Amino acid sequence: MFQGTISVPSKKPVAIMPHPPSGGKYGVECLLTKFYNDIYVLPGEATSVYQQVPLDIGLYCGNTLVTVVPIRPKYALYGPSDLGDLCRYSSSDIVQDLSPCLRTPIKIRLSNISKTVVRVTKAVIPLKGLGLYISPERMPLITSAKLVTHSLSYAEVTTELLPSLEVEGVSKLLVEPSIATYIMRYGL
């Protein structure tokens, strides 16, 4: 919840807009999203999955982001309790309870460059790379991610610059995407 006062110049509009998931009060750097079903990827193969993820609320004065308000954030530890990373947590059952304007699909491209079949149950996505576009119908579109598995316990997750969905006429960029990578070293 946001509580505070904003000094607004008389001609600057104040707007509430969707924003990619943020680190919340703990300042976490990643989003751990658990898949509804396990996904098995054969050696040398690739596939894509779509996962619903939560959005936060951005408070803007003109084109300036004032603050981000996380909407019902949940947290989980990825890895062992003494070395793991605290992440923002998302799963299908949590996100389905949110209003459609507070969630969006993310496309995650899974690629297996190992020599064995891998089972993928989750993805840990760096938050700082996620961007957000708005469609002509005012639908929020988050940027996609790529998960490349090197072994049963090691993968690289990289954010991409394009929206997860191909929608005609997407031109409004609300949050600039960047390429960021997270190394999943505690299993898939």
PLM segments and residue spans:
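Interface-prone segments of viral and bacterial extracellular assemblies
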Residues: 1-188
